[in-house]
Amino acid sequence: MAAIAGRETYDVVVIGNGALGSGLAYQLRKQDPRLSIAVVGPSHRTGAATMAAGAMINVWAEMAQGQFEDPALAERAGLTIKAMGLWDQHCAELSEFAAQPLSIKWGTYIVNNALGSPHEMKAVDYIVQAMRERQVAHEVMGPDAVPWIKPEQKGRVIRIVRVPDGRIDARQVLGAYDRFFAARNVDAFNEEAVKLEVGLKIPLLGAEKRVTLAGGAVLKTKNVVLASGTFSQSLIDQVPELRREVPRLLWGAGSGLDVSIPSWIRKYGGLDRSIFDIDAVVRTVDRGGACGVHLVPYDNGDFYLGASSGVWFEPEPKPRVHALHVLIRGLVEEINSAFFLANVGTRGPGFRPVSMDTFPLLGQAHMPGIWFANGTKRDGFTCSTYICREIAKEILGGESSLPKRFTPSRKLISYKTRDAAIDDFVAADVGGEVQHGLYLPPYAVEPHRAAKRAKVERIYEMRGIGNFGIHPELPHIYENDEFYAACQHARELE
């Protein structure tokens, strides 16, 4: 329960204790020591995206083709770039409350290999060109440049690119936030929020909000922050005006594997001792809507292998077989074959919050005092340093530098244009199938791609969509009548 017994009214109630919710409470307290703050969320954080992540500080390895040529995608990339520069200082400050000093280990290897699709080569070409144009330090390396990248022959390396992305164990960061709350008078409620009530609007000031917890306690406040990812949707649905104006949140499910090396291998060497030399993230680019195969070392002989990704209308409580199958194959076939003898345990699923247009929901909604730190998809942990600082400024009456485009109450933002979105869907879908073992003879490649294009074009026609682009991970939501009816929202460009 709360650190202050009997308190019912707060200046700010933050619903959600993952990277964004906890990070925002941290920034609020840092910027105003007198503020009364409550953070609501189960301490186990089951289902939180951060708990199922490695985690990587993903910036350049996540850039997609055309990222900087599309205004909305460029602004989303800007969030990660700005956040990246804040992490070292953030870790230095937060280390006071950590079980051990926090620091980012910088450096990530992106691999192109024989198992990837042609789209992956183009994706890495784009990343390299984008870094060159912006004078971002990187290195294009030969296939044998990193001695511990030793895949099976079928996954032979074609090219390696070292980018400045980083890694840190996200669980350590969350643990430091928890200790900070206890030390700095932030009330943490180890419960779920089950009810949200909003009174009549008072212009500029907002009305009193009431947040009911699972145990029956009621918290009153002028400012509620919805930062519990897609779990927030059940609260949004209770406020019709909010539900009508804010794009629906979907469940971006993802799971990973905790990989460890048995003691006998540590003693005798196993298949290849080079696995003990892994000292940086190694990954492919995004594949089939997922964040590729990526291995995050923890510097103690343990690793995180991730990550699956699928956008669902309803959550599923356990990982899917095909998702874990692809990860295990990728670990051995594409990173180091010596992992054949490793031990694994599942982590997740965690649910990345995916808005109906896949763009983030940031800042104050059209209803005063209702705030969002949500919809960040796979970027929430990486972006949290910047997003939380800026939202805290605005809650406290200052100016935020977050893009106005991502205001929560809005029309759906187009993913590029219709034609470009369809092209990206076909490339991503085929890339996902290649990841699952698809091989087509040359004469069948174009007919296969044409069939996919025709299928997604029928979805556009069925929903009467003109030049608006559907994100490549969402056509199945538009295709299903039940899902579409629940998620339908006004679109820009139409």
Residue map of PLM features:
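Helical element adjacent to the flavin cofactor pocket in flavoenzyme catalytic cores
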Residues: 160-215, 219, 227
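C-terminal catalytic lobe of FAD-dependent flavoproteins
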Residues: 336-436
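Short hydrophobic core segments
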Residues: 13-15, 218-231, 388
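Helix-loop-beta segment of a Rossmann-like dinucleotide-binding subdomain
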Residues: 98-115, 134, 140-184, 308-312, ...
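Active-site substrate-recognition segment that forms the wall
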Residues: 23-30, 42-43, 51, 55-61, ...
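Dinucleotide-binding Rossmann-like beta1-alpha1 core, especially the glycine-rich loop
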Residues: 56-146
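N-terminal Rossmann-like FAD-binding beta1-loop-alpha1 element of flavoenzymes
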Residues: 10-38
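Helix-rich C-terminal "cap"/substrate-channel and partner-interaction subdomain
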Residues: 394-494
